[in-house]
Amino acid sequence: NVLGTKVDVKAICDAAHEKGVPVLVDGSQAAVHMPVNVDDLGCDFYAITGHKLYGPSGSGAIFVHKDRLAEMRPFMGGGDMIREVSKDEVTYNDPPMKFEAGTPGIVQTIGLGVALEYMMDVGMEAIAAHEDTLSRYAQERLTGLNWLHLQGTRADKAAIFSFTMEGAAHAHDISTILDKKGVAVRAGHHCAGPLMDHLGVTATCRASFGMYNTTDEVDTLVDALELAHELFG
């Protein structure tokens, strides 16, 4: 989410399962950038969120391993999640209906389905390859700016670049200049305050590339950063 680090989730799952610990993976940051095979990962749960998959806000999905489904009790009551009910007992429907009480977000669910179908049509391998090309190009261009400090420089990373600028310029000020030049970045601690403390910074700007971005837009980012450096450097 901040550094673009690709985590060895399979190794974490294997280590946790050796101790009898179930694993929930927040795949919101990964699923949009690369193919995901939950069977290969070996996780018990894998959650995704719609608005980070080109879908509508308020939507999402979760994979639950069938063995875990059998162990879990519903957390919410409502229509369609019960098979029979009396004053003495309740019999739940089979999963997944057991966990889907009441009326779902119908429009959001349809929108998320269309977004996922679109991504499948483009192809996750193709998306990953395109973003890898962008990442390598951006890494080359950004490391050429000796007054820009990149946070997280592993060779094998997603197309996400967090940075600070030499001098006293705050990330919010830098992002304002970039915005004036038509470049959208995120500025702040990115819900990762402890990481900011570890890096020794109060905030960073984060440029994230997706399947719709181009190398020309990387150049636009660099041009806007050079302008910001002229103003704040």
Predicted regions and their residues:
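Pyridoxal 5′-phosphate
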Residues: N1-G233
